[in-house]
Regions:
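Bacterial N-terminal signal peptides
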Residues: 8-20
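Scaffold/interface architecture of coatomer-like assemblies
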Residues: 23-342
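N-terminal leader/targeting segments
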Residues: 7-8, 78
Length: 342
């Protein structure tokens, strides 16, 4: 069964009391931080005064502004079989929004800086697999480029922010190796928090588009989140964040049927956001998977356009990207929610 859905405002207030912050905020590529003291869990946010009943407004889509024009930004991966296609030009792409062709106003095939949230499942069932998962995540962090930034979050019965966004390799490695396995699985809470954290990361300049991605490792169904699947999926679709999900299937045959719900959730999150999903059965496959994700992130195109749709009704808009090169298959997020007048 799905975890019960919680209204967005209530979820935000509740999660403020269940997320443990064990690192200090750092700007990307800053000098190595001093070792911070271990912070106590944050107290719950105060209860807001009652308001008249009203339908909550959805959060706006995360769009990019250039010269006062609102742009829809896409991270596009193009493959031909098992190979990444990295030599396409702007004229090789066509973008359609709700069936109408759009005009590309920004195109870049050079690797843009990226903000990464790495989520590690540290529930009790990960006990024997955790050392290998740690080493794979450390190897992934070592592939960061100087302008990139990574945050480390682990989750069991609740998510814990072990290291806020930084390019400091030593701090990232320390955070990853500090994880231990115990408790249940608050998967939805962890994804919800990481999406909120990524919204805080700003581009270095007005001309830069900082890509965003979540790399999520979990070995089972959500069992203890306060936020429901539908709300997490909705928030993901309102972001410009690609989700790369690694679902570590149970090795025992009987456990694979129990994994079906987690498999569905991870597949949906990755598909809707233009990411990718992996389902290994052996933890020793993780280093190769992290390597594949790193290679994909380094092979993406950054493309943006100003929508020709003048309506500001907050409706869902479907995006289709095509290429003119035979055999080249593009992949990106499936759409976004249009702007509103509020």
């Amino acid at each position: 069964m799905w975890a019960p859905r919680v209204p967005a405002l209530f979820a935000s207030l509740v999660l403020a009391g269940v997320v443990t912050l064990t690192g200090q905020q750092q700007p990307p590529a800053s000098a190595p931080p001093q070792t911070p003291p271990v912070a106590a869990p944050q107290p719950p946010a105060p209860t807001p005064p009652p308001t008249p009943p009203a339908q909550p407004q959805p959060p706006p889509s995360s769009q990019v502004f250039r010269g006062g024009v609102e742009l829809v930004s896409l991270n596009v991966t193009v493959t031909d079989g098992t190979k990444y296609v990295t030599d396409l030009n702007q004229e090789d792409f066509e973008i359609y929004e709700d069936g109408a062709m759009q005009t590309i106003t920004l195109f870049n095939r050079e690797t843009q800086p990226i903000a990464l949230a790495v989520l590690l499942d540290t529930s009790a069932s990960m006990d024997e697999r955790l050392p290998t998962a740690q080493e794979a995540a450390v190897g992934f962090s070592r592939r960061l480029k100087p302008k990139d930034a990574m945050e480390v979050i682990d989750f069991n019965s609740q998510p814990h922010i072990l290291q806020t966004f930084t390019a400091d390799q030593a701090a990232l490695e320390k955070a990853i190796r500090s994880t231990t396995a115990n408790g249940s699985t608050a998967l939805y809470n962890a994804v919800y928090i990481s999406l909120k954290e990524l919204k805080k990361v700003k581009a270095a300049s007005a001309d830069e588009i900082r890509r965003q991605a979540i790399v999520l490792l979990s070995d089972g169904d959500d069992t203890s989140s306060l936020v429901g699947y539908e709300e997490v999926l909705d928030l993901a679709k309102r972001s410009e964040t690609s989700i790369y999900a690694i679902g570590l299937r149970p090795e025992r045959i009987g456990g694979r049927q129990e994994f079906k719900e987690a498999e569905f959730v991870l597949r949906q999150l990755s598909t809707e956001t233009g990411g990718r999903v992996f389902f290994p059965t052996n933890v020793n496959e993780l280093p190769k998977i992290y390597e594949q994700i790193s290679e994909e992130l380094a092979s993406q195109y950054t493309i943006a356009y100003a929508s020709k749709n003048p309506l500001r009704n907050g409706a869902w808009r479907r995006i289709i990207v095509r290429t003119k090169r035979p055999g080249a298959v593009p992949r990106t997020r499936q759409g976004y929610y249009g702007p509103t007048n509020r």
